[in-house]
């Protein structure tokens, strides 16, 4: 069993598991932190960004000044943002049989894999994962395509040039694998390969293994996966949460008795408590608005935004914010808000019961009805007419490199009355803000990450007790900034095995058994013999029939009677005739009694030596060697067949035939 690690990002994993003749890809996350190295794409022409000076090498060579621009001491690539893809050279991705998706954040690289690697298999995911994943991809494509950029920068990617660049460009990894965004045509083609599944649904893969999605408690439709055969079990835990938010709670019981547990997608902010972060978010938002400022919340169109809107729904009136407009701007804003209300079966129990009252499971429906929350596809059109300040704007992209958020950063960045509040943990907020410096607006960092922290995961591992744990190397040691915090790492026994990008891990786990069915008529013909009290054995002569990884023992064909004349050969004639087999032997040879038997039969000068696997009996006079081991006995003599047969018969006296 082998695990191929194709991604270096622990919360955006992409691994390939080879297990029992099947090749299974576990998630295909897309690392978007690479976009932080690029200049933002403004919706409206930005004189500030257009007039940034080009960057030149120290020797004065200016051939890079069209590709690289400098802003407040940072250097950025002036080109369409590119994304860091999973490894494509470590394994032939056309051999992947299936892809298992755990949540909508972990499927963003799907079009790159299904459309450009020769992949012909099936993708499995829950319906909310597919629908919300489609929205995220559609928004991403829309953000990139609506601001076309004429030039494409590639000179800086040359290894000899890259090492001369300042950080972080100099330290950027795998820049040769970075790619532009896919198209909607590729998105639709990739999503057409997905087969929808439900929680606890068992899916057979070629008769070899069975995969089952379990609720992970992190997002609508998010899943952990069980991959098992008749005698082995692998659990894949990715993006899980024990907090009571809007999704169904995590299914922990089904993870028990795993031979291997692959652990990914833990919280990116282990020291931040989500509840206190939400409290800080609300209080900072209220403070800014009361002082006449605007609040900008860079966000994804699904996920945490549902919980934030629910908290604000409860907070608005008590904080005196009922007259303040809330705007949600995204090409998929309307679809996202509607989807959240119709996936009732995937919600936690409290929200499911509201559906039958009838009452919308999320309160943002009421915010929309009362005009406190308005949603728009972009800043153009209706939004321009309805826009009034002070206000709160939820919009993407959290990287601040594309989307409507770029316009608001340019619009509000010069005033200290305004505040940008970062709630998504995927991007360093300091790096996200770098191309907007100098910045007068206030910046608040309230990362809300509900995924498992190290204390929770260590407790979980003690409860489910897998034989082996495998995880990214980032989880096996504290971060360099907090090297003294030994509690910020996975604690389990035996210690977890770690992996990194482009590494192949041989899992410490060997398959020992295979299930074989036996036909009833063959079972009737067996004659068991008791070899020990309570233990019986029977020999089986049969034909092993294997199809779709299912093995069946069938009765052997009866010997055909020879007939005169020539006959056309039939397909059944290819089956070999049943041969009369020699009896099998069982038992053990007690050395002391065997030596006594040899002496009784005239052998002398006998010497016994112990070995690691058994004993060696030397008949020095006859120049003969008898090796007695647990599973075999060898008689070695020099071309004396009579002596060999005589010794063989003495050995057989100690063994049972059946």
Swiss-Prot record:
The keyword Ubl conjugation applies. Its main location: nucleus. GO terms for biological process: RNA polymerase II transcription initiation surveillance; snRNA 3'-end processing. SUPFAM superfamilies: Metallo-hydrolase/oxidoreductase. It comes from the Eukaryota. Keywords: Cytoplasm, Isopeptide bond, Nucleus, Ubl conjugation. Residues 548-573 are annotated as: Disordered. InterPro entries: Beta_Casp, Integrator_9su, IntS9-like_C, Metallo-B-lactamas, RibonucZ/Hydroxyglut_hydro. It holds the Pfam family Lactamase_B_6. It is found in: Nucleus; Cytoplasm. A motif (Nuclear localization signal) lies at residues 566-570. One of its GO terms (cellular component) is nucleus. There is a cross-link at residue 58 (Glycyl lysine isopeptide (Lys-Gly) (interchain with G-Cter in SUMO2)). Although strongly related to RNA-specific endonuclease proteins, it lacks the HXHXDH motif that binds zinc and participates in the catalytic center. Its function as endonuclease is therefore unsure. Component of the Integrator complex, composed of core subunits INTS1, INTS2, INTS3, INTS4, INTS5, INTS6, INTS7, INTS8, INTS9/RC74, INTS10, INTS11/CPSF3L, INTS12, INTS13, INTS14 and INTS15. The core complex associates with protein phosphatase 2A subunits PPP2CA and PPP2R1A, to form the Integrator-PP2A (INTAC) complex. INTS9 is part of the RNA endonuclease subcomplex, composed of INTS4, INTS9, INTS11 and inositol hexakisphosphate (InsP6). Interacts with WDR73; interaction is required for the assembly of the RNA endonuclease subcomplex in the cytoplasm. Component of the integrator complex, a multiprotein complex that terminates RNA polymerase II (Pol II) transcription in the promoter-proximal region of genes. Belongs to the metallo-beta-lactamase superfamily. RNA-metabolizing metallo-beta-lactamase-like family. INTS9 subfamily. This is Integrator complex subunit 9. It comes from Bos taurus (Bovine). The gene is INTS9.
């Amino acid at each position: 069993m082998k695990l191929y690690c194709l991604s270096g990002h622990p919360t955006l994993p992409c691994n390939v598991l080879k297990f029992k003749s099947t090749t299974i890809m576990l998630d295909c996350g897309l690392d978007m932190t690479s976009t932080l190295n690029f200049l933002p794409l403004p919706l409206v022409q930005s004189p500030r960004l257009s007039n940034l000076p080009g960057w030149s090498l120290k020797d004065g060579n200016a051939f890079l000044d069209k590709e690289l621009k400098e802003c407040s001491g940072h250097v950025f690539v002036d080109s369409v943002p590119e994304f860091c893809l999973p490894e494509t050279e470590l394994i032939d991705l056309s051999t992947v049989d299936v892809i298992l998706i755990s949540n909508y954040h972990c499927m963003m690289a799907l079009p790159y894999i299904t459309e450009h690697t020769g992949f012909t298999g099936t993708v499995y995911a829950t319906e909310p994962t597919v629908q919300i994943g489609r929205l995220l991809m559609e928004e991403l494509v829309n953000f990139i395509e609506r601001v076309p950029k004429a030039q494409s920068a590639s000179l800086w990617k040359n290894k000899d040039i890259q090492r001369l660049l300042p950080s972080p460009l100099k330290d950027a990894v795998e820049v040769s694998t970075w790619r532009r965004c896919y198209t909607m045509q590729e998105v639709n083609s990739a999503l057409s390969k997905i087969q929808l599944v439900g929680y606890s649904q068992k899916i057979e893969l070629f008769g070899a293994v069975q995969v089952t999605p379990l609720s992970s408690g992190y997002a609508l439709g998010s899943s952990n996966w069980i991959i098992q055969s008749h005698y082995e079990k692998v659990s894949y835990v990715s993006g899980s949460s024990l907090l009571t938010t809007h999704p169904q709670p995590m299914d922990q019981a089904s993870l028990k008795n795993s031979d291997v547990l692959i652990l990914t997608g833990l919280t990116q902010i282990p020291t931040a408590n989500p509840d206190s972060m939400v409290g800080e978010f609300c209080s900072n938002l209220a403070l800014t608005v009361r002082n006449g400022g605007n609040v900008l919340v860079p966000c994804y169109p699904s996920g945490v935004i549902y919980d934030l809107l629910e908290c604000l729904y409860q907070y608005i009136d008590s904080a005196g914010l009922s007259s303040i407009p809330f705007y949600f701007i995204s090409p998929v804003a309307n679809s996202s808000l509607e989807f959240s209300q119709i996936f009732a079966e995937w919600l936690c129990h409290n929200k499911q019961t509201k559906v039958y009252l009838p009452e919308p499971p999320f309160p943002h429906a009421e915010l929309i009805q009362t005009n406190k929350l308005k949603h728009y596809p972009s800043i153009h059109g209706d939004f321009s007419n309805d826009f009034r300040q002070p206000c709160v704007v939820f919009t993407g992209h959290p990287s601040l490199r594309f989307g409507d958020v770029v316009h608001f950063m340019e619009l509000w960045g010069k005033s200290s009355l305004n505040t940008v509040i970062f709630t998504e943990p995927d991007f360093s907020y300091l790096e996200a803000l770098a191309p907007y410096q100098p910045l007068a607006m206030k910046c608040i960092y309230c990362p809300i990450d509900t995924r498992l922290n190290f204390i929770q995961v260590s407790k979980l591992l003690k409860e489910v007790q897998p034989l082996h744990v495998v995880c990214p190397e980032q989880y096996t040691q504290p971060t360099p900034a907090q090297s003294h915090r030994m509690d910020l790492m996975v604690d389990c026994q035996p210690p977890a095995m770690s992996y990194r990008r482009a590494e192949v891990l041989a899992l410490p786990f060997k398959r020992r058994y295979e299930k074989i069915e036996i036909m009833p008529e063959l079972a009737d013909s067996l004659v068991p013999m008791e070899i020990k009290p309570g233990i019986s054995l029977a020999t089986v002569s049969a034909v092993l029939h294997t199809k779709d990884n299912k093995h069946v023992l069938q009765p052997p064909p009866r010997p055909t009677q020879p007939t005169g004349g020539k006959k056309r050969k039939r397909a059944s004639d290819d089956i070999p005739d049943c041969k009369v087999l020699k009896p099998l032997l069982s038992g053990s040879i007690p050395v002391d009694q065997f030596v006594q038997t040899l002496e009784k039969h005239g052998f002398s000068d006998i010497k016994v030596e112990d070995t690691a696997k058994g004993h060696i009996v030397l008949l020095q006079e006859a120049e003969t060697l008898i090796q007695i081991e647990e599973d075999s006995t060898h008689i070695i003599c020099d071309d004396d067949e009579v002596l060999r047969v005589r010794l063989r018969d003495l050995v057989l006296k100690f063994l049972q035939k059946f």
